[in-house]
């Protein structure tokens, strides 16, 4: 079931990211952070009074938005852009203001935009960390957005009141969708890369164009089909555009809609335009897929329009591998949705990835691999004068694959050594198109069997 989305908007330096971090706490998913995949995490789940929802820091979605040195006019424009994105995509909007600066014109302009929308708005007056400042929060009644909630995102005071108000405005909970056991594939990518064309080619029929109704939201479009005996649900974000989806003539990602599609899917297919090449937005969304621990494939569309004499398949494959270097295990396929060239190959790839995500490695096999890896490249860290030791490993779960490693000092295992072990696992067992998660835990030495052969 899709979780409601709560978007935080506001000018630079009002405390959006501080509030975001306070509300989501420490993210539990354990994956490797690598430069170039995502910026600071912009979204995370939280639960309050039994309701689970996704919090989004819209400043993180729009590059450069939290630069306090921007000219005032640019700050206003970008804050408007944040607000419009939230109006387009979120279920509840948290509008953050700064009590220390008081009510300023930039806040009033954004408030006017929010009042014209049909979305519920919760007004958070931040940096109210003294009694006088809490009293000054009443000034923000003038924004016409209801009761201002005085809080200090840094200290956490008032955050409970804010969460109460957020939950009060969340849409009514929906019944859990019946599990149809189909393979759920999300087709994501920038506008005009051919998402609709690919979907139409796969299902063999023209899709109805979704009407653009200002002020409303729609769930992603689901299309069901069967391919090689496997039931498949295609989750399509194509055609879903809002009045706010065009900014100075350049269409931007429907980022929050893409997040919902990624949340629901097993496998995400990121479509890249062969003529334009991959963009920072494409790598950003790929990072979102990896953050969610979903399967990933890179699909390069419009390959029929490329002059192969000037830009060969090998050249294109090298370029894509370099851009998506943080996911070297993700398959890359070149297609033409328009002509149908290799279009159904994407379904074969998705089925392969799903099989890889459900692959299990026996405990004896993973420990044989660990012994060999430690023998060839021992960990060099020290713990209380003793060498770091890895005793034992086992696969804990599938979809995504999770491996547990037991050590005398799990916190001392270096990121580089974790990557080494991941590479050894992939060399031996593949795990094409899926993140694998390595978790290191402590265990008393006498309770384990040492794979290093030493006691």
UniProtKB/Swiss-Prot annotation:
Residues 4-174, 183-358 form the EngA-type G domain. One of its GO terms (biological process) is ribosome biogenesis. Residues 359-444 form the KH-like domain. Transmembrane segments: none annotated. One of its GO terms (molecular function) is ribosome binding. InterPro entries: G_ENGA, GTP-bd, GTPase_Der, KH_dom-like, KH_dom-like_a/b, P-loop_NTPase, Small_GTP-bd. Pfam families: KH_dom-like (PF14714), MMR_HSR1 (PF01926). HAMAP family: GTPase_Der. This is GTPase Der. It comes from Herpetosiphon aurantiacus (strain ATCC 23779 / DSM 785 / 114-95). The lineage of its organism: Bacteria, Bacillati, Chloroflexota, Chloroflexia, Herpetosiphonales.
């Amino acid at each position: 079931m899709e979780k409601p989305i709560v978007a935080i908007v506001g000018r630079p330096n009002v405390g959006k990211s501080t509030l975001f971090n306070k509300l989501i706490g420490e993210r539990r998913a354990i994956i490797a952070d690598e430069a170039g995949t995502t910026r600071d995490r912009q979204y995370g789940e939280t639960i309050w009074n039994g309701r689970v929802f996704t919090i989004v820091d819209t400043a993180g979605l729009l590059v450069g938005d939290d630069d306090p040195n921007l000219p005032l006019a640019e700050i206003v424009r970008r804050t408007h852009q944040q607000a419009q994105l939230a109006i387009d995509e979120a279920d509840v909007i948290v509008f953050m203001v700064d009590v220390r600066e008081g009510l300023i014109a930039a806040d009033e302009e954004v408030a006017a935009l929010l009042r014209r929308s049909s979305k519920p708005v919760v007004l958070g007056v931040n940096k109210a960390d003294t009694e006088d400042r809490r009293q000054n929060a009443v000034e923000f009644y003038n924004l016409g957005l209801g009761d201002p909630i005085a809080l200090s995102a840094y200290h956490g005071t008032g955050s409970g009141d804010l969460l109460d108000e957020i939950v009060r405005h969340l849409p009514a909970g929906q019944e859990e969708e019946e599990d149809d056991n189909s393979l759920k594939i999300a087709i994501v990518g920038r506008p005009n890369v051919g998402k609709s064309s690919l979907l139409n080619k796969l299902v063999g029929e023209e899709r109805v164009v979704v009407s653009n109704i200002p002020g409303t939201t729609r769930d992603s479009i689901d299309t069901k089909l069967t391919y090689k005996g496997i039931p498949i649900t295609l989750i399509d974000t194509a055609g879903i555009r809002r009045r706010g989806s065009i900014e100075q003539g350049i269409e931007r990602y429907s980022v929050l809609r893409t997040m919902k599609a990624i949340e629901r899917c097993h496998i995400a297919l990121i479509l890249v335009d062969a003529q334009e090449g991959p963009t920072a937005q494409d790598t950003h969304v790929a990072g979102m897929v990896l953050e969610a621990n979903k399967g990933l494939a890179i699909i390069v569309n419009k390959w029929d329009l490329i002059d192969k004499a000037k830009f060969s398949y090998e050249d294109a494959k090298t370029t894509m591998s370099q851009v998506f270097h943080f996911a070297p295990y993700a398959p890359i396929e070149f297609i033409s949705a328009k002509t149908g060239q290799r279009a159904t190959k994407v379904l074969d790839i998705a089925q392969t990835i799903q099989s890889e995500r459900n692959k299990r490695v026996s405990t004896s096999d993973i420990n044989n691999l660990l012994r060999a890896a430690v023998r060839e490249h021992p960990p060099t860290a020290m713990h209380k004068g003793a060498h770091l030791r890895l005793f034992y490993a086992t696969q804990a779960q599938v979809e995504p694959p999770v491996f547990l490693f037991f050590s005398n000092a799990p916190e001392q295992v270096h990121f580089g050594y974790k990557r080494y072990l991941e590479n050894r696992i992939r060399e031996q067992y593949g795990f094409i198109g899926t993140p694998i998660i390595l978790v290191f835990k402590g265990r008393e030495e006498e309770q384990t069997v040492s794979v290093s052969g030493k006691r």
